[in-house]
Amino acid sequence: MVGKKLAGRLPDVHLNEAGRTQAGNLAAAFSGLPIKAIFSSPLERTLETAQPIAREHDLTVEILPDLLEIDFGNWQGQDLEELKKSSDWKYVQEQPADFRFPMGESFAEAQQRMAACLTHIGEIYQKDDLVVCVGHSDMIRLSVAHFLGIPLNDFQRLRIETASVTVLYLSDGKANFGAINHVLSFPENLKPGD
């Protein structure tokens, strides 16, 4: 989101000061880890998150288009309050498995794209290799749901915070999670009942 708009794949959406601080905190947290590679969505905000981690490890960020945000089609750049008034909003919240964004992709297509990308990365690196993928919260939720066998209609029950860490172990065609939505500091925007 940008302010109160659905950012999606909009170009020129950069991290704000808080986001840059979070990216620096991630780089510091990862500084002692033997990272072999770092991959990112091509969008500016993910590259700006990935670059401090890459610099810390003397690596180059490798751009993977399959890590891109969901293609929200005509919804991209639209005011969220206006979208919430649309007849499709409730449908998206309750039956996302059956929804395709107008002029965009479906959640099922986005999930398949992300799962295939992560599976491919798991196949080209050794079992104990550590790689970092920087992506988008909905795409991370979709991939967590995929690898845990959570029905697509329930993926929105998962919460992924900005600059959180999800650790996925892929080996011999099997997936296990070491962490989901691990935050380095408690998100300020969380209040009881959120």
PLM-predicted stretches and their roles:
Residues 24-90:
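Phosphate-coordination/substrate-recognition cap region in phosphate-metabolizing enzymes
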Residues 45, 139-140:
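Alpha-helix capping/helix-boundary segments
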Residues 24-28, 111, 115-123, 144:
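Generic structural signal for well-ordered alpha-helical scaffold segments
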Residues 16, 20, 43, 107, ...:
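Amphipathic, non-transmembrane alpha-helical scaffold segments
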Residues 59, 70-81, 123, 127-129, ...:
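Acidic, low-complexity terminal tails and accessory targeting/binding regions
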Residues 129-135:
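Generic beta-sheet signal
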Residues 88-109:
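Short glycine/proline- and acidic residue-enriched helix-loop micro-motifs
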Residues 1-36, 51, 55-59, 78, ...:
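An N-terminal RHG(E/S)-centered segment typical of histidine phosphatases
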